[in-house]
Amino acid sequence: MLKKISIFIFLVSILSSCSGTGSKIKPSITSSNNGSTVLYFTREGGFLAGGILAKIEVDGREIAKLGTKENITHNVSSNYKVKISGAGISGLGIGKDTAAGLDDGKNHFYIISVKQGLFSMGFKINETTESGFKQSQ
């Protein structure tokens, strides 16, 4: 009985780590006329070490875990710092990347991609334009 429970717990943890918190639906981009800064994130296709999710933190607070081709938006009210890393136990040792920006009342667009080397792997974040963001989806 203990063996069945252990297998069940293992399978649940593995399957739940594969599901991202982002959306596959393309976000509607609105012009920022109320002075609020909106961050738009999308993750490109490409798997990393068996489907590791990209954990996005803004100012040290986790806002999403994105799977491939998922999107998320986030509002900020001050200057911000974005950190991208691997999520969960399988994400330990995965390379991290950061970006920073100003609360200037404009929309900011970011594309998260996978970077792999001979002995390394990780996520990379690049700021882009609105048209570049739309083309990446």
Model region roles, listed by residue range:
Residues 1-20:
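Sec-dependent bacterial lipoprotein signal peptides
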Residues 18-137:
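Short loop/turn and low-complexity linker motifs enriched in small/turn-promoting residues
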